[in-house]
Amino acid sequence: DTSARQTIALTEYFLDTYNIDRSRVYAEGYSGGGETMSRVMGMRPDLYTAYLQCSSQWDGNYTEVVKARVPVYFAIGEKDEYYGSEPSRNAYNAIHKLYEQEGLSNSEIDRLLVLDIKPTSYFSSEGISNQHGYGGYLFVRDKNIMGWLFGQIKK
């Protein structure tokens, strides 16, 4: 939790010190950074507009994210060599279930939660065979993924 608390402190410092549009504060975590950012999102989701988790697993609390209604996008390769796609699928399902319990419709949940498990062809079409190692490279260059992230605006 130390890294998560440090990330929160740094975000708060930036928000307090600089002229930042608080309706557009985005978080992204890749691999181990995704584990840390999921902990951040489980502690202080209110600091962020949306969260993109790439090639990682969720280690944080789900309920705070659901309470805050912060949009979350999971991007991972179907054959991610480090995590596999199951941890992302499990986190997606857990958050989805919490939203259902809150009474949200599927269309409302779909605006808040995305599970994007990329097939092997997504990587091989770019000449890449290592899904985990190059997932972070490809995902941040993917216009659909980044368009989703930067299209989120906090009300």
Where in this protein do the model-derived segments appear?
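C-terminal catalytic histidine-bearing segment of alpha/beta-hydrolase fold enzymes
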Residues: 75, 81, 100-155
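Short glycine-enriched nucleophile-adjacent loop
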Residues: 34-45
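A conserved short beta-strand
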Residues: 46-58
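Short, proline-enriched alpha-helix->beta-strand connector loops that line the catalytic pocket
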Residues: 66-72
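Gly/Ser-rich "nucleophile elbow"/oxyanion-hole loop immediately N-terminal to the catalytic nucleophile
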Residues: 2-31, 42
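Short alpha-helix in the alpha/beta-hydrolase fold that links the catalytic acid
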Residues: 83-101
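Alpha-helical scaffolding within the catalytic cores
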Residues: 9-10, 55-65
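Alpha/beta-hydrolase-fold catalytic nucleophile elbow
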Residues: 28, 54-55, 75
